[in-house]
Amino acid sequence: MLGKLLQKVLKAYFVQQSPVEELLPDLNVIFTDSQNPPDFLTSLRRRGMEVEYPESAKIIFPKPEYWFRWEQRYVYEDVDKGEVFFLDGYGKLHEGIGSYEAQVFLNENREVVSVFYQRLAPYDTKWEKDREGWTWFLKGSGKLVFDTEIVSFDYPLVLGKRWRSEGRMGAMTVESRGVVIAYISPDGEVEVAEGYSYQPPVKPPEPLEALDFMGLDELLEVGKATTTWDKVVIPDGPRKGENVQGYYVTMVEYLLNGSLAMKMEIWKDVRGCVPVIAYHPAGMRTERQVLVARSWCL
């Protein structure tokens, strides 16, 4: 999982006092799937963050702040190894640090695999098609806390949107770079952002049913709980009740002193549900890991 890898890399840096470039491959990437990044109409700069929106926008996923709950749970399965993992809340269910909530992943033995400390903040995107932005700020993982936060995710979602964020931990720069790289339609067709290449690691799953909140054992017993795309609607906010189908895929890269340390992709539907998480070979990771959700409750 990303948190465990992040801790391993940073511990190696601080204990060995070795340059990150010696611990990681010299990849020197900006977006590893990008050949000719497209021109952008709107560019927004905030403190420690740059956001760029594409000229055109067919489908927009709005921020889920209106219906978001920290207390969400997922049951995920590793598609290659068959192992079960739980996302035990984006927050509130475990102790955070200061104003940052703890997002916790557990293995099937209920042991903590990774912890991310995050906060959420709305902002004005200045983008005429959707001015309601919503940023996930990452402060650290486990015992490793950054001096300054970085961005781990940002709304609204639209094909081709990009962001970049930079922070520090001691003498080290910590950077995140994200792109909404693809839209996957309900029939499985993949539209890739201009200038990028992408292939789904798994066949697109059916959308998950939003179950009432329950315990981990109960959720595990539910098994696979899906619904149909015609029932996937925006739960609240200005676009409440609108049926928006398909998944957006966001690719996020984390860099330490300019070298790629981790790369992950996150699928989301318009409700903010995350059916697929994939960790790609990068830094100290040599094998891909793909997690597909069986069930989701909130």
UniProtKB/Swiss-Prot annotation:
Give the superkingdom in one word. Archaea
UniProt name for this protein: Uncharacterized protein AF_0812
Which organism was this protein described from? Archaeoglobus fulgidus (strain ATCC 49558 / DSM 4304 / JCM 9628 / NBRC 100126 / VC-16)
